């Protein structure tokens, strides 16, 4: 995880930045699934936590070899005109680290009740007692909107940037490039 590549969204009057970032992130996810492995992480250096926005830059963190392999894939077809690429570069030192991870909200009590009813053979009334409407939790985190390849449903993938740390701990990344224990340099 000693190299990185910045991909910046170009201003576009037809597409808002959040929409372009969602498309870019979805294409990256597909490329990471095809490439396999758990050694590529992402961060959003232009993050604006006060407004829950990821910003207009996606940073991909990897070794030089993993970054070269990713860039050799044709995963950005149809999107290149909307993007500006930096050159792969070495991570500056010293730099702090942080986890960039997915957060799943338990925001839909109705869905949770249906799941509980299916799994435990409960009536709707019993499920409502166990999961009242008050359990709904809205997240105030930035997100990308993706489309599930298996169901076709659109969903929000909420992203949390954890606190800064002096050192990185060992861990990997998901096929979204998000932490499953791994840390990325933050600069």
From Swiss-Prot:
What result follows from mutating residue 29 to D?
A: Cleaves pre-crRNA 910-fold slower
Keyword Transferase applies: no
The record's remark on the cofactor is: Metal-ion independent.
Function text: CRISPR (clustered regularly interspaced short palindromic repeat) is an adaptive immune system that provides protection against mobile genetic elements (viruses, transposable elements and conjugative plasmids). CRISPR clusters contain sequences complementary to antecedent mobile elements and target invading nucleic acids. CRISPR clusters are transcribed and processed into CRISPR RNA (crRNA). Processes pre-crRNA into individual crRNA units. Absolutely required for crRNA production or stability.
Q: What is the effect of changing residue 155 to A?
A: Very little pre-crRNA cleavage, still binds crRNA
Describe its assembly: Part of the Csy ribonucleoprotein complex with a probable stoichiometry of Csy1(1),Csy2(1),Csy3(6),Cas6/Csy4(1)-crRNA(1). A Csy3(6),Cas6/Csy4(1)-crRNA(1) subcomplex is also formed.
Q: What is a single molecular function from GO for this protein?
A: RNA binding
Biological process GO annotation list?
defense response to virus; maintenance of CRISPR repeat elements
User: Which of UniProt's keywords are assigned here?
Assistant: Antiviral defense, Endonuclease, Hydrolase, Nuclease, RNA-binding
Q: Where is the active site?
A: 29 (proton acceptor)
What is the name of the gene encoding this protein? cas6f
Query: RNA-binding: is it a keyword of this entry?
Result: yes
Name it.
CRISPR-associated endonuclease Cas6/Csy4
Q: Mutating residue 29 to K has which effect?
A: Cleaves pre-crRNA 130-fold slower
Listed Gene3D superfamilies = CRISPR-associated endoribonuclease Cas6/Csy4
Q: Which NCBIfam families match?
A: cas_Csy4
> Outcome of mutating residue 49 to K, per the record?
Restores biofilm formation upon phage infection, crRNA forms
What is the additional note?
Answer: In this bacteria, Y.pestis-subtype CRISPRs do not confer resistance to phage DMS3 or MP22, but instead are required for DMS3-dependent inhibition of biofilm formation and possibly motility.
């Amino acid at each position: 995880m000693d190299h990185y590549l910045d991909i910046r969204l170009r201003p576009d009057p037809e597409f808002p930045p959040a929409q372009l970032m969602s498309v870019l992130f979805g294409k990256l996810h597909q490329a990471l699934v095809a490439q396999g492995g758990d050694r590529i992480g992402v961060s959003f250096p232009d993050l604006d936590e006060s407004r829950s926005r990821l910003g207009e830059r996606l940073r991909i963190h990897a070794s030089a070899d993993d970054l070269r392999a990713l860039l050799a894939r044709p995963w950005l077809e149809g999107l290149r005109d909307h993007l500006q690429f930096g050159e792969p570069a070495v991570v500056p030192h010293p730099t702090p680290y942080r986890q960039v991870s997915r957060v799943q909200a338990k925001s839909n009590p109705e869905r949770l009740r249906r799941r509980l009813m299916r799994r435990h053979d409960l009536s709707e009334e019993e499920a409502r007692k166990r999961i009242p409407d008050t359990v709904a939790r809205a997240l105030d985190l930035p997100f990308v909107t993706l489309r599930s390849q298996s169901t076709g449903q659109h969903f929000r993938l909420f992203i949390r940037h954890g606190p800064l740390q002096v050192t990185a701990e060992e861990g990997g990344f998901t096929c979204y490039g998000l932490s499953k224990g791994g840390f990325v340099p933050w600069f």
